[in-house]
């Protein structure tokens, strides 16, 4: 099972591997065992529940690390899961050259959708902004709420 998983992962486009994509290769216990072995061998890095990223040895320490930064992996994960997203407010302001402060947190705006999925690599954690965490005066107004 492990060899079949490894071949499938190597042939996939993108850096993110979802557990549900590998379900056809064996029973849940076999998949769990094979994924655990691949993580311990440094072929994959676990970034969330059922979400793995392709790994490569680090240039300095040789410790396995994801081949892409957390922001890129999170964006690909959201796309694969069908979650609509955009960059967080701080990243948008920086990209639009409205500020010179470099955002150091990985933040995604999910609009009206509440997400509790935890994605992390090491100590870096993806944080979420949505209409529930945004102050009332900064919330997006829906089109139906506009006066006629």
Spans of features found by a protein language model:
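Nucleic-acid-binding surface
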Residues: 8, 56-148
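Short beta-edge/loop segments at beta->alpha junctions of small alpha/beta modules
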Residues: 1-72
């Amino acid at each position: 099972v492990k060899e079949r998983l490894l071949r499938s992962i190597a042939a996939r486009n993108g850096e993110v591997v979802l557990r549900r994509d590998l379900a056809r290769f064996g029973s849940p216990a076999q998949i769990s065992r094979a994924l655990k072995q691949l993580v311990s061998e440094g072929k994959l890095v676990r970034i969330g529940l059922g979400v793995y990223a392709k790994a490569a040895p680090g240039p300095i320490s040789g410790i396995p690390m994801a081949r892409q930064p957390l922001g890129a992996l999170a964006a690909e994960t959201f796309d694969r899961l069908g979650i609509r997203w955009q960059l967080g407010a701080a990243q948008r302001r920086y990209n639009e050259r409205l500020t010179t402060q470099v955002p150091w947190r990985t933040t995604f705006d999910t609009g009206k959708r509440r997400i509790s999925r935890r994605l992390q690599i090491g100590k870096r954690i993806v944080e979420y902004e949505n209409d529930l965490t945004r102050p009332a005066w900064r919330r997006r107004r829906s089109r139906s709420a506009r006066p006629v």
